[in-house]
Amino acid sequence: MRYKNFDNFDINLFSNSKKEDELFSPRKNMEDNLNYILGTYLPEFKTSNVNLLFYGNPGSGKSFLSYCIAKELLDKGFGVIYKTADELIQDLINIRFNNNTTLENMLVDCDLLIIDDLGAEQKNELSVTELFNLINKKLLKNKRMLVSTNLSIADITKIYSERFCSRLLGEFKLRKFFSDDIRIKLNLKNNKK
């Protein structure tokens, strides 16, 4: 996580060319996301109760930006837990069947729980129920979350229950990400050297 921070964030990786189905270029979109995070979300983190949902295509900067936020908050002394959705489901099953209250309290009470790659986890009634219960507990305790997903809003509403979607889409600030896959772009650039 050391190199995944705002100092190493390169806005020039994002194209200035607007795609016809989007209102802005990928660079303008990312600038807007960065301006919100650096200008509002992080400065007001201690006093506000904003949950974020980053959604968009793979490689568009969601996970990198999530790491940047985590590092910034950890450096300021906040408690942050970063889990992929799949890892989190395994933890929630552990909590349920092993009565692991220590782990449950950590997940519920941390200042920020980051759930990366929602939609990549194995979905069944138990996993969706446990994930819903955790999100609901955190919302009731005014504990913040950041969720990232490659799913569109339409896909989220098709895959998850109405109750789950109501919490996720009704209680989270939605931030859209789009661009060419930056991971591929960086890998191709590095392989040319």
Residue map of PLM features:
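Pre-Walker A (pre-P-loop) alpha-helix and adjacent loop at the N terminus of AAA/AAA+ ATPase modules
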Residues: N8-L52
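Short glycine-rich substrate-engagement loop in P-loop NTPases that contacts/grips substrate
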Residues: K18-E31, Y55, L74-D109, Q122
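Conserved alpha-helical scaffold flanking the Walker A/P-loop in AAA+ ATPase domains
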Residues: G39-P43, D91-L113, V128-K137
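Conserved catalytic network of the ASCE P-loop NTPase/AAA+ motor domain
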Residues: E44-K46, D75, N105-V108, N136-K141, ...
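Walker A/P-loop nucleotide-binding motif
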Residues: F45-S66
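P-loop NTPase Walker A phosphate-binding motif
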Residues: F64-F78
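Loop/turn-to-beta-strand initiation segments
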Residues: F78-G79, D109-L112, K141-V147
